[in-house]
From Swiss-Prot:
<keyword id="KW-0238">DNA-binding</keyword>
<comment type="subunit">
    <text>Homotetramer.</text>
</comment>
<dbReference type="GO" id="GO:0009295">
    <property type="term" value="C:nucleoid"/>
</dbReference>
<dbReference type="GO" id="GO:0003697">
    <property type="term" value="F:single-stranded DNA binding"/>
</dbReference>
<feature type="compositionally biased region" description="Low complexity">
    <location>
        <begin position="114"/>
        <end position="124"/>
    </location>
</feature>
<dbReference type="InterPro" id="IPR012340">
    <property type="entry name" value="NA-bd_OB-fold"/>
</dbReference>
<dbReference type="InterPro" id="IPR011344">
    <property type="entry name" value="ssDNA-bd"/>
</dbReference>
<dbReference type="Pfam" id="PF00436">
    <property type="entry name" value="SSB"/>
</dbReference>
<protein>
    <recommendedName>
        <fullName>Single-stranded DNA-binding protein 1</fullName>
    </recommendedName>
</protein>
<feature type="domain" description="SSB">
    <location>
        <begin position="1"/>
        <end position="107"/>
    </location>
</feature>
<dbReference type="InterPro" id="IPR000424">
    <property type="entry name" value="Primosome_PriB/ssb"/>
</dbReference>
<feature type="region of interest" description="Disordered">
    <location>
        <begin position="114"/>
        <end position="156"/>
    </location>
</feature>
<dbReference type="GO" id="GO:0006260">
    <property type="term" value="P:DNA replication"/>
</dbReference>
<dbReference type="GO" id="GO:0008047">
    <property type="term" value="F:enzyme activator activity"/>
</dbReference>
Length: 156
């Protein structure tokens, strides 16, 4: 399937609106993306045009974004670009939306402290042993190998 995937770097422009819908959590917010360029005449960085996107996130990404983002936060958003045109009150309007697959704080402009979320669903499959991708003598690549630990060294 051909989709337009983009990565937008900007600032959260509106308070994220969280909704718990029948098919799972959803959040939306506006993202302001302003081009900056070096103005040689002024010898300074200058703001260019600002584009606004409505960012949509679903499921766990929605829950985490809602609890992590605030107006003004610098963020990086990756997702599918959707340009929509509709008619409201007799006027044709165009909007650019991003269906987000990843959202994060822009660490080029600040720091963050990451916290993992607790898993809400129990895993239905038993854990599988990690395959050893190095081939043991006489073995086959990709087969799990029993864990090999060195013999303990006596102390003292």
């Amino acid at each position: 399937m051909n989709e337009t995937m983009i990565c937008a770097v900007g600032n959260v422009a509106t308070t994220p609106v969280f909704r718990d819908l029948a098919n799972g959590p959803s959040v939306r917010f506006r993202l302001a993306v302003t081009a900056r360029y070096w103005d040689r005449e002024k010898n300074a960085w200058t703001d260019g045009h600002t584009n606004f996107f409505t960012v949509w996130a679903n499921r766990q990404l929605a829950t985490n974004a809602s609890g992590s983002l605030a107006v003004g936060d610098p963020v990086v958003v990756q997702g599918r670009l959707k340009v929509r045109t509709d008619v409201r009150e007799g006027q044709s309007r165009t909007s650019a939306d991003i269906d987000a697959v990843a959202i994060g704080h822009d660490l080029a402009r600040g720091t963050a402290a990451f916290r993992r979320t607790a898993r809400t669903e129990a895993s239905t499959s038993p854990p599988r042993p990690e395959p050893n991708w190095e081939v043991p003598a006489g073995g086959t690549p990709g087969e799990p190998v029993p864990e090999q630990r060195p013999d303990p060294v006596p102390v003292g």
